[in-house]
Each structure stands twice: as structure tokens, then as C-alpha cells.
């Protein structure tokens, strides 16, 4: 049934070919085209190469009517069905057969060397394809003969899959994570870098900075507490008067009021030596 489903395909067509009756080969040295009557061909016509399955057919047909003159089945190339001559690349010896099984060897030749090249390549490509198909079929048979790997679950065997962002039975649909801080995220500082804080503006610095009132010193001495206070307190630092700002007039007024309200303490004699 496989033979009935095979179709015939055309591999090559050459409109001009000459057929020669060749003498029998006397030795195993091969055929020579110079032994033929090249100027007097026995038949001229058209050559067509077809394939059906793995077998190629060289058909010699009439140029006008297409009637079949002879046919040469080729099951292997290179082989006995098609041979090249030893003294030219344009001539070949083929084995023709009829329907009864009888066979004969004849010579064929092409006027153009390119036609002879196409004839040779068409047969080579066909049997190269046949070889590849045989290798693929052999590999598939070997694969079928190997024991198949059972990847199915055994009875009672289960697996557990943990996939994120999928509705589960208990908690329902998982909520996507949101960024903290109102959706704004800050990038971390670069490694080894230092973060510097910009200095405040001049107006803010003047309004927020208040110089503490100086503590008056007594040269004649006082109580023990006053002497200790003098040792601990740093020397007064004279600061230049800032540029008057309209915004901070009230603050300076409060400071002057507070400094004037401090009473002067009377110096008291003491046995401590003042440094």
C-alpha cells in the first residue's frame, strides 16, 4: 500500500541528448567515448529524470510526441546503472531495462557540458536525500525500541507548588505590597559617601541665635558660690553687633530688658584666691 501512495517527481529535464550503441567492454579499464561513433548518434531526443520513492528513473523520450524510447531505473549512484567514461565528462553509460526484465548498456552524451553537470548533480542530490531518510528512519526505530521513561504520578503521589500573587483558600487574594511614606521611596546613600546638611539662611540664623548675657565679675571678691561660678564660666566673648533686621527688633528688646533687670550683687570678702 505504501507503493501506491508514492508519487512521481521530476528531478531534471534536458531537451537534447544523443544515444550511442557501444561495443562490449573488453577489460575492466572502463568505457571510453572515443571508441564510439560520436559523429553518428543512433538516436537523439529528450532526457528526463524522475523519482518515485527511493528509485530514480532516466527516461529517454521523443522531443515532439513525448513517447518513451527507453528507461533506466537507478537504485544506487554511483553504481552499475550509471557509469562515467574515462576520457570525457559529457558522456555516460546507462543500463536500460524493459518491462520483461531484459537489460542493455547504451551510451548517452550531451552537447553542452553544463547539461552533463546537471545530470550528474540531480542523481547525487536524490540519493543523498535517500540516505538521510534512511538514517532518520533508523534513529526513530531505535528510539521506539528503547524503554520509555515513565514521568507520570504514581498512585497517591502529590506535589506542592508555592506561587506568589495567587488566590489561596484561606487568605484570599494576596494584596500587592505598597511603598511606605506615601508612595515615595528614597534611594540609599552611595557607599562611603557623606551626607552634608546645607547651612541655614541668614535670616533664620539671626532670628534664632540669642547670645547669653555676660555674668559680671567682681575684682574685690564675693561669696564662695560666686568664686566657683567665676572659675566655671568662660571668659566673655565680644560679638559684633548684627545688622539690624526689622523682624528681630522685638527679640533684642526683650534681651536688653532681661539683662537690665538682673540686680548687681555686692561683693563679699572671701579667703579664696581668685584666678
UniProtKB/Swiss-Prot annotation:
Region (Disordered): 170-191, 254-275
Motif WXXF motif 1 in this chain: 252-255
Modified residues (Omega-N-methylarginine): 180
Modified residues (Phosphothreonine): 211
Pfam family, one: DUF1681
Disulfide partners: none
Biased composition (Polar residues): 256-275
A cellular component term, taken from the record's GO annotations: plasma membrane
InterPro entries reported for this sequence: NECAP_PHear, PH-like_dom_sf
Keyword line: Cell membrane, Cytoplasmic vesicle, Endocytosis, Epilepsy, Membrane, Methylation, Phosphoprotein, Protein transport, Repeat, Transport
Alphabetized Gene3D superfamilies for the sequence: Pleckstrin-homology domain (PH domain)/Phosphotyrosine-binding domain (PTB)
Record keyword Transport present: yes
Location(s) in or outside the cell: Cytoplasmic vesicle, Clathrin-coated vesicle membrane; Cell membrane
Record bears the keyword Protein transport: yes
Oligomer and partners: Interacts with AP1G1 and AP2A1 components of the adapter protein complexes AP-1 and AP-2. Interacts with the GAE domain proteins GGA1, GGA2 and GGA3.
Domain comment as written in the entry: The WXXF motifs mediate binding of accessory proteins to the ear-domain of AP-1, GGAs and AP-2 through hydrophobic interactions. Selective binding to the GAE domains of AP-1 or to the alpha-ear domain of AP-2 is tuned by the acidic context surrounding the motif and the properties of the second residue of the motif itself. The WXXF motif 1, which is preceded by an acidic residue and has a glycine in second position mediates specific interaction with AP-1. The WXXF motif 2, which is followed by the C-terminal carboxyl group negative charge, allows specific interaction with AP-2.
Medical condition linked: Developmental and epileptic encephalopathy 21: A severe disease characterized by intractable seizures, profound global developmental delay, and persistent severe axial hypotonia as well as appendicular hypertonia.
Protein family per UniProt: Belongs to the NECAP family.
Entry protein name: Adaptin ear-binding coat-associated protein 1
The organism of origin for this protein: Homo sapiens (Human)
Amino acid at each position: 500500500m505504501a507503493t501506491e501512495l508514492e508519487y512521481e517527481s521530476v528531478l531534471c529535464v534536458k531537451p537534447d541528448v544523443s544515444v550511442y550503441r557501444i561495443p562490449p567492454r573488453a577489460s575492466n579499464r572502463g568505457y571510453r567515448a572515443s571508441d564510439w561513433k560520436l559523429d553518428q548518434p543512433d538516436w537523439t531526443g529528450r532526457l528526463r529524470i524522475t523519482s518515485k520513492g527511493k528509485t530514480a528513473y532516466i527516461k529517454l523520450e521523443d522531443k515532439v510526441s513525448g513517447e518513451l524510447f527507453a528507461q533506466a531505473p537507478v537504485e544506487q549512484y554511483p553504481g552499475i546503472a550509471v557509469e562515467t567514461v574515462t576520457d570525457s565528462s559529457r558522456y555516460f553509460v546507462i543500463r536500460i531495462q524493459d518491462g520483461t526484465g531484459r537489460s542493455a548498456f547504451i551510451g548517452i552524451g550531451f552537447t553542452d557540458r553544463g547539461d552533463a553537470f546537471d545530470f550528474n548533480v540531480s542523481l547525487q542530490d536524490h540519493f543523498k536525500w535517500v540516505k538521510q531518510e534512511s538514517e532518520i528512519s533508523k534513529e526513530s526505530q531505535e528510539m521506539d525500541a528503547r524503554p520509555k521513561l515513565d514521568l507520570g504520578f504514581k498512585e497517591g503521589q502529590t506535589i506542592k507548588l508555592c506561587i506568589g500573587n495567587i488566590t489561596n483558600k484561606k487568605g484570599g487574594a494576596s494584596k500587592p505590597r505598597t511603598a511606605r511614606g506615601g508612595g515615595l521611596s528614597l534611594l540609599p546613600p552611595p557607599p562611603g559617601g557623606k551626607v552634608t546638611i546645607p547651612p541655614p539662611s541668614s535670616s533664620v540664623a539671626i532670628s534664632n541665635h540669642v547670645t547669653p548675657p555676660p555674668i559680671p565679675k567682681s575684682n574685690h571678691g564675693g561669696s564662695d558660690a560666686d568664686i566657683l561660678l567665676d572659675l566655671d564660666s568662660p571668659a566673655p566673648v565680644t560679638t559684633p553687633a548684627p545688622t539690624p533686621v526689622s523682624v528681630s527688633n522685638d527679640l533684642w528688646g526683650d534681651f536688653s530688658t532681661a539683662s537690665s533687670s538682673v540686680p548687681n550683687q555686692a561683693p563679699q570678702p572671701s579667703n579664696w584666691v581668685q584666678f
